[in-house]
Amino acid sequence: MIPRSRVLFKHLGTRPRVIAPVLMGQMARPTISIGDALAAAPGGSGNLLALVEIHAGRDNGVFAQEQRRRDMLRWVAGLEYASDVRRRLSVTLRMTANLASSIRDAVVESEATSLVLEWPTTASPRRHGLSDLTRQLLPDRVTDIAFVRSNNPNQAITPRSILASIRGGASSRVVASTAAMLADAYGSALTLVHIQTDLQHPDRSRREWESFEQIVEELQRPSTMVRLHRHDNPAGGILEEAAGHDLVIIGSRLSPSNPNVLVGRELLRMVRRLDCPVVMVRPKHVSQSEPAYPIARNGHRA
């Protein structure tokens, strides 16, 4: 564990403008609590975008639409939660026949820097609609996206201890800055872990470790704890490190050739075994030079 000194970290200097879109009936409270925390950063702001769905040819009269608006407002009001983090998301109601288009409009209007979306489990009542919405939004690459996954839909996320897995590279800076913003908002202890594996080429392992060290130095958080964990399986290493933490933050898979695949099978299996909530961060920019898979010692993909 290595304490670090304060230096400049440019990503943390930006003012976050957060949008948390929600659909009626989804597991919204964990997602909203993360949105509030991200918007609590200095100069930050946020919007809870309540999307009232209009289906062509079904109950589209004025009375029916007004009833759906009232139902949505009551549902959103019922999502209030107790927390030391002050509520930062203002509520905007939008009637829409195209969810993705309405979110894109809201992003442009508010100049949003981050979207916060539910990462649905198999128990999520709106999982099919949310998965389809995610597929439509991923190609845009206009904002960073934080995907929030929790096994307790009725409980806001209020972690005392946060673990963030940092690989190294440009995308990892967004993961690290997101973790730092959440830790600052919640007053949480923050641990950054770097998982090393023998499966990839030693030169790449060295570059990633040097990048990780630089990211830690740039974070400007002397209280941040740092760990190096060696494991033959990165997902297994994260699972072991996650014990005792209340929130785990990971980066999404970054594959220019297949940008819609956010997480590999092994990592997804690991996430399903975690007892605590998970935030997966997908940066808006995908590096064209970053391989989608680790490079093994023999020069081939592992």
Each predicted region: which residue ranges?
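Gly/Ser-rich helix-loop-strand patches that form or flank binding pockets
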Residues: 1, 32-34, 106-155, 239-302
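Small/aliphatic-rich secondary-structure junction motif
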Residues: 7-74, 80-92, 158-228, 247, ...
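Phosphate- and divalent-cation-binding pockets in alpha/beta enzyme and binding domains
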Residues: 30, 102, 237
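A cross-kingdom feature marking solvent-exposed beta-strand/loop segments within repeated
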Residues: 87-92, 98, 102, 124-129
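Conserved active-site histidine-acidic residue motif and adjacent donor-binding/catalytic loop
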Residues: 94-100, 229-235
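A short, acidic, amphipathic alpha-helical segment used as a generic capping/interface helix at domain edges
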Residues: 210-214, 230-242
